[in-house]
Amino acid sequence: MPRDETPEREHAEQQSRQALEEEVRELRRRVEEAPSRVRALEEKLLEVSGALAQTQAKNEKLTFTLQQAREHIQNLREEVEKLTQPPSAYGVYLAANQDGTADVFTTGRKMRVAVHPEIDLAAVRVGQEVVLNESFAIVSVRGSDVIGEVATVKDVLDDGSRVILLGRADEERVAQVAGHLQHPPLRVGDSVMVDPRSAMVLERLPRPEVSELALEEVPDITYHDIGGLDRQIEEIQDAVELPFLYRELFGDYRLPAPKGILLYGPPGCGKTLIAKAVANSLAKKVEQVSGRSVRSYFLNVKGPELLNKYVGETERQIRLIFQRAREKAEEGVPVIVFFDEMDSLFRTRGSGISSDMESTVVPQLLAEIDGVEALRNVIVIGASNREDLIDPAILRPGRLDVKIKIERPDEQAAREIFARYLTPEVPIDAGEVTTLGGGDAEKAIAVMIERTVERMYATSDENRFLEVTYQNGEKEILYFKDFSSGAMIENIVRRAKKLAIKREIAGGSRGICLDDLLASIAKEFKEHEDLPNTTNPDDWAKISGRKGERIVFMRILLHEEEGQTGGRAIERVATGQYL
């Protein structure tokens, strides 16, 4: 190798070595700087990731806002469409046609309109309200209208689908009956609501005046609840129950059932109780004989409330009551129409002072009882404490056939009435049970009742009540027993029970004792010292059940020992409670 090439080679190697060393140093520097660069890149990656997440959240928020805006715009469009739609008309459904159309009454005229496919006309009733669109097609079905005019059914036409109505000023018109009112059909006299535009009867209205006056409830009173009236109960059973229980036997003898019964007598002696017990007992007896469940109907007519200031209203209500009774009787069940305070409605014609109302009311009742339309399975029972005021035509045979006097209770009847209220279920004082009954509560009650009745019916000076002077100059002493009644006996027992309750509350003994009953009698007599007050002596005598010579003067004997010896003319004082 030439000598001159050696330095050049060494120089080249040196340069190459330097370059390699430089490259090594660069690589070492890069290796040393790599972790910091990695950390920087990681930090930058985190920043970019956070920015991306923020951008995504913004995008989601913008998307949600955009969706809300779209929905709001859609709602606004729907509202605008609703506001710009033409109004829907209402109509009354009349009938369906074979071609799928329907007849409706709307805007004062009858129209044949199309029906939306989703509406089933078979389920739509006549008289229902329908909604029509701008093309007068039925798009919806509603219930019947709830407002209209009130009218009264005068007559029922066809099969009950049409009726003749009486409206304002007795104007008559023919109207169609809505489908839901045709079964059961309307009856003559029913109060209904009618749509005057379509002449459609939409609703049957209750008649409060008739519903309140004639109650169809069957009372739960039995003959066992009535004490001291065994003879009267037997008479009314013979008159009412036998004709219904043995129809064939009565038919063999050609003996018609009585049409009516009059229960008369002083107030508070059980007239209304007997009438209630009749309805209850009659249904049970008929059920036993026939073997089928029978419900009797008791139409309780409150006499004074039937009176009406408008001419003909009282007569109309009497007709409605008997019409209802006939409808119930057609089912083959007994119906009792009970007129309480009968003298207030059916007074003797011509006896009115300020009106002649009775001149039309009495004939209406007579026509209902034995007119052209015979009463079958219907019994009229009247109750009154002034039977002398009732028109004689009502009391004649063939109308109110049976007349039963409900008298004031005697001593035996009083014992039976007391026994209805003083029963072993009522707490009795333990001392009385031991002393009077020897440990037997029922025996103690019997002794208490016996002594109470003896005190109540004694004709001693402490029981003297009135001295009455008759027109012929005779005088008579009346005792409290002459004015006793079942209501008075019930009130005495109530007072005794109240005394026992107050004594037990105060820490005393429990139960009723004899002293409670005796104290109650004294208090009852004390409170009724003004019992005979009346403006007319004859009225007092008749209502109290004492008939005969006219009473012209009376004086109270209850407090005579206290210096009140003077009498008082009864014309100067007000009407009393019981008499």
Swiss-Prot record:
Keyword Secreted: no
GO process annotations (BP): modification-dependent protein catabolic process; proteasomal protein catabolic process
GO cellular component terms, A-Z: proteasome complex
Keywords associated with the record: ATP-binding, Chaperone, Coiled coil, Nucleotide-binding, Proteasome
PROSITE patterns: AAA
Ranges in a coiled coil: 8-86
Subunit field text: Homohexamer. Assembles into a hexameric ring structure that caps the 20S proteasome core. Strongly interacts with the prokaryotic ubiquitin-like protein Pup through a hydrophobic interface; the interacting region of ARC lies in its N-terminal coiled-coil domain. There is one Pup binding site per ARC hexamer ring. Upon ATP-binding, the C-terminus of ARC interacts with the alpha-rings of the proteasome core, possibly by binding to the intersubunit pockets.
Identification of the protein by name: Proteasome-associated ATPase
Lineage: Bacteria, Bacillati, Actinomycetota, Acidimicrobiia, Acidimicrobiales
